[in-house]
Swiss-Prot record:
InterPro entries, per the entry: KH_dom-like_a/b, RbfA, RbfA_dom_sf
Gene3D superfamilies linked: 3.30.300.20
A molecular function GO annotation: ribosomal small subunit binding
Disulfide bond positions: none
A single GO BP: maturation of SSU-rRNA
Annotated GO CC locations: cytosol
Binding partners and assembly: Monomer. Binds 30S ribosomal subunits, but not 50S ribosomal subunits or 70S ribosomes.
Family, as annotated: Belongs to the RbfA family.
Upper classification of the organism: Bacteria, Pseudomonadati, Pseudomonadota, Alphaproteobacteria, Candidatus Pelagibacterales
Residues annotated as transmembrane: none
Function as written in the Swiss-Prot or TrEMBL entry: One of several proteins that assist in the late maturation steps of the functional core of the 30S ribosomal subunit. Associates with free 30S ribosomal subunits (but not with 30S subunits that are part of 70S ribosomes or polysomes). Required for efficient processing of 16S rRNA. May interact with the 5'-terminal helix region of 16S rRNA.
Keyword tags: Cytoplasm, Ribosome biogenesis
Protein name as catalogued: Ribosome-binding factor A
Localization annotation: Cytoplasm
Amino acid sequence: MADRIGKPVSQRQLRVGEMIRQSLGMIFARNEAKVPNLETNTITVTEVKMSQDLKIAKAYVLPLGGKDSELVIKKLKECSFLIRKALSKKIIMKYLPKILFAKDDSFEYAEKIENLIKQTNK
């Protein structure tokens, strides 16, 4: 796996990304961030990609059922400081990364590819 400029992702980036993904999953499952007007126990964190300097984490999330994903992403972005505060209690790092949230489209993409394969096999 390589990032946008072609440099390979380091083991440290992968390890820290996975640690943040697991911690975010626990935070959402237990509603530790206290995000208002959001059912956080239905959010799945599918992947976290770290920048090379480990100061930015891009978390790909998907609400259960995939509905209202734009609203969920908007609420998460608005309350990212609460989530980061809850994350700081779980992970000890010199610099806790800034968390950016994005919708995970990989399941929709995989379904689209499957449908194309089924159409060609007919």
